[in-house]
Amino acid sequence: MRLLLCKNWFASPVISPLLYTRSLYSMANTTSFPIAPQAPPNWSFTPSDISGKTNEIINNSNNFYDSMSKVESPSVSNFVEPFMKFENELGPIINQLTFLQHVSSDKEIRDASVNSSMKLDELNIDLSLRHDIFLQFARVWQDVQSKADSVERETFKYVEKSYKDYIHSGLELDEGNRLKIKEIKKKISVNSINFSKNLGEQKEYITFTKEQLEGVPDSILTQFETIKSDKDSNETLYKVTFKYPDIFPVMKLASSAQTRKQAFLADQNKVPENEAILLDTLKLRDELASLLGYDTYANYNLYDKMAEDSTTVMNFLNDLKDKLIPLGRKELQVLQDMKAEDVKKLNQGADPNYYIWDHRYYDNKYLLENFNVDLEKISEYFPLEATITGMLEIYETLFNLKFIETKDSQNKSVWHDDVKQIAVWNMDDPKSPNFVGWIYFDLHPRDGKYGHAANFGLSSSFMIDDTTRSYPVTALVCNFSKSTKDKPSLLKHNEIVTFFHELGHGIHDLVGQNKESRFNGPGSVPWDFVEAPSQMLEFWTWNKNELINLSSHYKTGEKIPESLINSLIKTKHVNGALFTLRQLHFGLFDMKVHTCKDLQNLSICDTWNQLRQDISLISNGGTLSKGYDSFGHIMSDSYSAGYYGYLWAEVFATDMYHTKFAKDPLNAKNGIQYRDIVLARGGLYDINDNLKEFLGREPSKDAFLKELGLQN
């Protein structure tokens, strides 16, 4: 997942040393590299610092806009260039201040960051709806159109996008409607921040006895906090939080169907306070779209996406659903038969029907029994530090980069002791490396931290003047289990996929070469393409040779046996139709609630559960769960009416991989072409043109359909 912190101002985000564990990012001798020309950001903020800097930004921004509104005869030199400079310089500090709510271990700092986000979002809305500035941009837009051939491309695109974003935001409407729009946007912003805060701050858990957790190995049980039962002081209970490293193993390994059901429903029904926030937001979005002349919020939010409108999106999703359902039914029947056989053998009185909370368990059991895939055993060959070092080596080979971990004695350049800070260098000229930027790895869960996996762009690249570049800063935030006294953190294969994916976003952030920050990084491309670069890189995590090279058993240092890897790779598409149907549930729910014309009578709970049962094909067992209360994507300006983008982008990701890398995954020539054509150009050129140049033809969906088993 990609989270962009700073919205454009003109638009509407102890590892114990063990034998055979390589030191993190020690591939190069750091003394052979020059000192980075740009120091990493300083993270030693206090709540007072955050508040003070926020107020300073607000005052400076209002003063700047006031001065720009008074410019007579606005032109590129006296109006546009000052705006670009202002936007470039402001983005990094805003992103720092608002990022801390997701990662700081200090609740006072998180709260200050949330307050900063609310104030800065309100400022952004105020500024984006200033009619006097819109009129200035309208004058400049008219001027640059008349002499387009003599205007630099980035400048032209900047003015064009600014003007069109103003129109999209309703600046051509009368003052009364503009005020209504401003009020609605501010309410939506507050809702989004509170929804996210509730998720980040939740400390909910469910308790089980060891007997109830039968099937969950001791290696997992040791990571759970234990408490004594209120009913029996001699009984130990295990606290299972809803963080991924806790809840997923229970859903996957607990042999008790009742335990799985309780865990599933508790996880799905966490943060109940978010339901009212979501419902209010849906109504506000519908009202906003209506004011702006759109029939639905989906069509309003799709205006700058590749798909362009909700009809195209719904046709794409429904066509895919119809193709996948027959295959999904075949996959499901096998799993249903497995459960029925279990009930017949083990518990005559148990319910033989297959429910949504059974799926992770029987999916895992099927892999184990039919492919001899023991995911826990496989993880022993992928200790976190050694594996990430190996993954970075792949990125180094593909993109001609070098990753060098750096530290400062006072830890002012990181926000937590767990965080790794890495300088990235371009090695196109190995005798004279060029600095690329900074990337952070924040990989373990903790209280108050963002609970999923995401890349946060903290500062996009831009030119300060004709010869000096401000370098990008980006952060990977994940939640991999920490090491224990007995073993290091071990990565499951799906976690390796996750890291590869998020690092793909990070590389997109780092290699941008345009002059203006607005046109660099993932946030500069259409949001239904933004996942494609990362999805493409996931293919390397299914390559036999790359996985063997990555492996290093945490006790012996041995490479993983080929038999284990061969079995794992065979499972790539096992139950793939059911997995994709689950993604379609998210995408179609997102579109359903954002195209509904009668929200007053919409039961969001019934809609969520009925769609899941109909699309995923798996029974809800008569229960109603509220997974939408933790569906963070739907509260994002970018991902709302946009979750379809994961599948849409996968069409391009699969095409790029099979065309350029399937036969030679470490082809550096193709990797550098990809870096320079698809990534480094950002949003300055049409993404379809970039794809056509890189592929040597128009993009095709054939490889995507083959991957899904829908085409020979």
From Swiss-Prot:
Listed SUPFAM superfamilies: Metalloproteases ('zincins'), catalytic domain
Residues binding Zn(2+): H501, H505, H508
PROSITE patterns the UniProt entry points to: ZINC_PROTEASE
Biological-process GO terms, alphabetical: peptide metabolic process; proteolysis
Record-linked CDD domains: M3A_TOP (cd06455)
Disulfide bonds: none
The keyword Glycoprotein belongs to this UniProt entry's keyword annotation: no
Active site (UniProt): E502
Family classification: Belongs to the peptidase M3 family.
Protein name (Swiss-Prot/TrEMBL): Saccharolysin
Organism phylogeny: Eukaryota, Fungi, Dikarya, Ascomycota, Saccharomycotina
